[in-house]
């Protein structure tokens, strides 16, 4: 018996006039999921608590049974782990942009002309040449203009502000301590030095000279944000006795799984958008389940969230239909406890995460099948699970997998 | 106004093919409970939390308003209290079996031929002759081959393993400390000595000589298990200002009530099984309610749980129908707040407790009557209570009894 949490990222929504006052999920044609709903049990779920807007990171941590208020201080550690940086508890990690600054350090392009190549060479210089007292610097490029920075050493703190000014036309923000500790002051100072040194090291780098010659914005400064301390996390397998794996499109979700000690599977062609190679996503999910190497599989597909952020009503609906196609295989598997959910709602009207609960269903043997027959936010609210929380999910799955012990006698 | 929690132990279940995909409760003819559901309010309940499989002990502690994660370390203390051993906070208590060992101390019968008489005489020897340093030994026989052991003294711990090997053909397990404390080492040593001495004291006891002559297995060794420390518990009446009583079939449930400082009522003819004297159970429940001596009554009938453990589909269904007969009198009482529930599900397909929520209903004056008309797991999930927790029950009952104060102004 395998347990699966299948997260359709950001799927939850609100009624949309253009869809006849249906949500994208309600309006989508989803025969596979409807069939599983008909034969399963449904409900709504507050991933963290009612009205709280979860991030994808805090939502997934919660679904894996960790307390996000305890282990989550920022996105950096999970982004870093997601691109295979070997982070350690206590490391301070950041997401970064390669950006373009002019000679006065005014940021003229936060994404450095959406640079697609050469950042590995820039990263090499950063790793070799940045000098920050006794603090070890680990920098790695990610997709496009993105990268991660990890600071390792004694006396560091994550209680500091961001360097990224968020809007062009400004200098990098001076990083400031958020509390009175020496550690916060020291770390803020270190990050400010890092930003300055990045400009000095990158501005005349051959990669950038060539970009300027080609009329492209140079990637001549690095702007850290999303600071967080890498948490002490009890590995998933130690907590539950289940060998776990994560099949996901984005580094953030894979990073969460990595920090939880789970294996991760990369999906060639996955973009995390509605343009993702859905056939490849499909193949890697099904292959992982069928490999029989794992007791527990966390799946995440990201396009519905992206469409929600973009306010793309029909794109979101159509992507949900693509995901339903993936589900056809799972519908016919007998030896799984499948929990299908979103991590949060990303209403196309809000263009960001909201605190609306998400619709969930379970496919498993032995359920108290309810009389809900289609998958939708409002249909699910009438289901036999009523209203649950994200912290309940792994308890419910493990109970249905029959791998839990009685508490008491 | 009297408050009553009526627990039909282990009643919750899952759909069963042999019952036309109904649960035993859904399939049972329950006119009295259906009538109260029609005139009352229904819901589902997670006694501890969703997906957690409660023991009957931890479930009842929760229903009485105690935190099982705080007060529950094992079943022993409640079994001891249930047969009127006067336990004190700090005592270390065990359930025990009288068993049969051969001359090499191999256990050949864990239940000593299901001995029915003479264990009181064996217990007398144990109480008088066992010598365990400065530790006081209190041993008492219970039904059949069962007994309880209480250790009282300084420097004791419940962080030790069991002596019972669980399967015949093995020697008693050497009891081991579960942590590094001196207390755990000392207590493990004490229990190992107790087991050895029990064999020396009982092997040639006249009761056993006679059993051997009659071709019966002798009860010549005592195997403790289910160790727990007797908790400090604020008495029920002090917590709630309600004089409470428990009418139950089994020692475990009465023991929980006793440790909570409640009175208990013994029911002649009660077996805790589906063969119980249901008329006697009925009489003692109704007499206790009508005595007007108590503000709060905890009722437990145990047969549905036993049938669940046995996988006895029709036995479970038929027993629920018997319980419904008991309910006819309660249906017509006006001055009660009656909360009917199971403590946990014991699906006949699982043959053990599961984490499935249990169906509940309340009969009381002034309720927001919902439109559910029959008592069943899936019908209840559509009720006006939605999904509640075991910790909510006494709050709801006391509110409906109108004995609680506003919090604030």
Curated annotation (Swiss-Prot), chains A, B:
Q: Where is this region: Disordered?
A: 160-179
- Record GO biological process: glycolytic process
Region forming the signal peptide: none
Statement: the UniProt record of this protein carries the keyword Transit peptide: no
Q: Which SUPFAM superfamilies match?
A: Alkaline phosphatase-like
Q: Which family does it belong to?
A: Belongs to the BPG-independent phosphoglycerate mutase family. A-PGAM subfamily.
Per its record, how is this protein called by name?
A: 2,3-bisphosphoglycerate-independent phosphoglycerate mutase
Gene responsible for this protein: apgM
């Amino acid at each position: 018996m395998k347990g699966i949490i299948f997260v359709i990222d950001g799927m939850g929504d609100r009624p949309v006039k253009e869809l006849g006052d249906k949500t994208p999920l309600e309006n989508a044609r989803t025969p596979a999921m409807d069939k599983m709903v008909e034969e399963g049990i449904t409900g709504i779920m507050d991933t963290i608590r009612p009205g709280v807007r979860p991030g994808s990171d805090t939502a997934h941590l919660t679904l894996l049974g960790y307390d996000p208020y305890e282990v989550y201080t920022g996105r950096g550690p999970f982004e870093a782990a997601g691109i295979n940086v070997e982070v350690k508890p206590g490391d301070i990690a950041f997401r970064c942009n390669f950006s373009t600054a002019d000679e006065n350090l005014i940021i003229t392009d936060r994404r450095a002309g959406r640079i697609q190549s050469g950042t590995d060479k820039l990263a090499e210089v950063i790793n070799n040449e940045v000098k920050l007292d006794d603090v070890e610097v680990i920098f790695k490029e990610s997709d496009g203009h993105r990268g991660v920075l990890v600071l390792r050493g004694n006396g560091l703190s994550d209680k500091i502000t961001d360097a990224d000014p968020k809007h062009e036309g400004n200098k990098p923000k001076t990083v400031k301590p958020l509390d009175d500790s020496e550690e916060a002051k020291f770390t803020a100072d270190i990050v400010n030095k890092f930003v300055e040194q990045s400009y000095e090291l990158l501005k005349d780098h051959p990669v950038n000279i060539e970009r300027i010659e080609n009329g492209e914005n140079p990637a001549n400064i690095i702007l850290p944000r999303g600071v967080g301390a890498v948490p002490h996390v009890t590995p998933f397998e130690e907590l539950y006795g289940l060998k776990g794996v994560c099949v996901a499109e984005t580094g953030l979700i894979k990073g969460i799984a990595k920090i939880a000690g789970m294996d991760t599977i990369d999906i060639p062609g996955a973009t995390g958008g509605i343009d993702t190679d859905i056939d490849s996503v499909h193949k890697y999910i099904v292959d992982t389940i069928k490999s029989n190497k794992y007791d527990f599989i966390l799946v995440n597909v990201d396009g519905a969230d992206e469409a929600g952020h973009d306010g793309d009503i029909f794109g979101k609906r159509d992507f949900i239909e693509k995901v339903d196609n993936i589900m056809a295989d799972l519908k016919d598997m007998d030896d799984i406890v499948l929990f299908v959910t979103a991590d949060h709602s990303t209403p196309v009207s809000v263009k960001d995460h909201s605190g609306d609960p998400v619709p969930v269903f379970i496919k498993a043997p032995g359920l108290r099948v309810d009389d809900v027959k289609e998958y939708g936010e409002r249909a699910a609210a009438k289901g036999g699970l009523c209203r649950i929380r994200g912290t309940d999910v792994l308890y419910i799955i493990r109970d249905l997998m029959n791998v839990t012990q009685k508490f008491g006698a």
